[in-house]
A protein has these predicted regions:
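Nucleotide-activated donor-binding/catalytic signature segment of Leloir-type glycosyltransferases, i.e.
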Residues: 235-256
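Short alpha-helical donor nucleotide-sugar binding micro-motif in glycosyltransferases
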Residues: 255-256, 263-268
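Short hydrophobic beta-strand element within catalytic cores of glycosyltransferases
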Residues: 293-296
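Short His-centered aromatic/hydrophobic patch
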Residues: 90-96
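Aromatic "clamp/platform" in nucleotide-sugar-dependent glycosyltransferases that forms part
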Residues: 276
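Carbohydrate-associated surface elements
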Residues: 144, 167
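Conserved acidic donor-binding segment of nucleotide-sugar-dependent glycosyltransferases
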Residues: 308, 312-319, 328-333
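Conserved donor-binding/catalytic core segment of Leloir-type glycosyltransferases
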Residues: 4-6, 183-204, 210-213
Length: 362
């Protein structure tokens, strides 16, 4: 089997979409088999091979093309590569019209969309609707995302929308992180959150964690919050920490590598991301595989991932409820084995089986 993967980015950024599309690349390279090949076309990444690429390609990658945000080059390359492949997997709705255009030059090419979250929770333009109608299947990361697509495009056949949950990158599974984790641990409850600190992503709820921290510290005076990630919203969040009087209890680590991230997960007492617009919430799995309880918002697809045995939910923006949930997770620890078992249900082999069942179906 010959596959073409279209991605907005793979290695340029560390957002959730880039991380999951690396795993799509890994799965496609393994599904292609010894006689198959995979081509990868990326809109935003720079030309050349990222040193991490071999970790995801299993020797079956035929060509990797980065277009450095050149949309015309991306379109022309999609047509060229589409001519020699059997199936095209499109990693973002914005790229889907390109996938349909590629099909004009190869009538046997079937294309599929990976639908994540807020990228598809909205009304669609004419070109997007046209492209959606031509998709062989739409792979939704959650049932919530599936319902949102049908809400905004009700003329689609519901049977063509299938749920393929996100998966955990095996590279982020626990490794030998004990010394690094021990160096990070403090004397009080340690709350961890991870993500891009972008001014366009204020819905993530980092500010609500900062606002809840003074309430948490009334019960646990040594509680701290570590915010992993960088972006243009960091100055605002730093000012908020100062206004709340918790500057000394909030640490901004900036962007870190995978080894440091594993150490952060291992060292924390709980993970929190009270976001109101998560199509899945990949970071929850990353925390769960380390046996850490998770706090999320009662919104989007998060309730599909966080269940009572592994964490807690709070209404988005409800500061007292967020603080109470954090306190409950500290005072009533969840079973790490049960948490890891929940993460294991989303492990890469299960993801690969789900994907194969869709892509290889007659």
């Amino acid at each position: 089997m010959r596959f073409l993967l279209l991605s907005p980015e793979l290695f340029l950024a560390e957002g959730g979409i880039a991380r999951i599309l690396r795993l799509y690349l890994k799965a496609l390279c393994e599904l292609a088999g010894p006689e198959g090949r995979v081509d990868s076309l990326v809109l935003n990444d720079r030309p050349g091979l990222d040193p991490r690429l071999p970790l995801y390609t299993a020797g079956n990658l035929r060509e990797q093309v980065g277009c450095r945000r050149d949309k015309l080059r991306f379109l022309l390359q999609a047509v060229r590569l589409g001519r020699r492949n059997d199936k095209l997997v499109c990693g973002h709705l914005h790229l889907l019209p390109v996938a349909r255009l590629a099909g004009w030059f190869n009538p046997r090419l079937e294309y599929y969309l990976v639908a994540h979250g807020i990228d598809v929770w909205r009304p669609y333009g004419p070109a997007e609707r046209w492209a959606l109608r031509g998709a062989r299947r739409i792979l939704c990361v959650s049932e919530y995302t599936r319902r949102q697509i049908l809400r905004f495009c009700p003329d689609l056949n519901p049977a063509d929308l299938v749920v393929v949950p996100n998966t955990l990158d095996p590279l982020l599974a626990p490794a030998t992180v004990a010394p690094a984790a021990a160096a990070l641990r403090g004397s009080g409850p340690r709350i961890l959150t991870v993500g891009r600190l972008a001014s366009t992503d204020t819905y993530k709820g980092y500010d609500t964690l900062i606002e809840a921290l003074p309430l948490v510290r009334r019960v646990h005076p040594n509680a701290t919050l570590r915010i992993v990630g960088g972006g243009d919203d960091e100055p605002r969040l730093r000012r908020l920490a100062q206004q709340q009087g918790v500057t000394d209890a909030v640490t901004f680590t900036g962007r870190i590598d995978d080894a440091a991230l594993r150490a952060e997960y291992a060292a924390c007492d709980l993970f929190a991301l009270p976001s109101r617009k998560e199509g899945f919430g990949l970071v929850f799995l990353e925390a769960m595989i380390h046996g850490k309880p998770c706090l999320g918002a009662r919104a989007g697809a998060v309730p599909e991932v966080i269940t009572e045995p592994v964490g807690a939910l709070a209404d988005y923006g409800n500061i007292p409820e967020i603080a109470a949930a954090v306190t409950d997770l500290v005072q009533h620890p969840r079973d790490p084995a049960a948490i890891r078992a929940r993460a294991d249900s989303f492990a890469f082999p299960a993801f690969q089986r789900h994907l194969a069942a869709v892509l290889l179906a007659p």
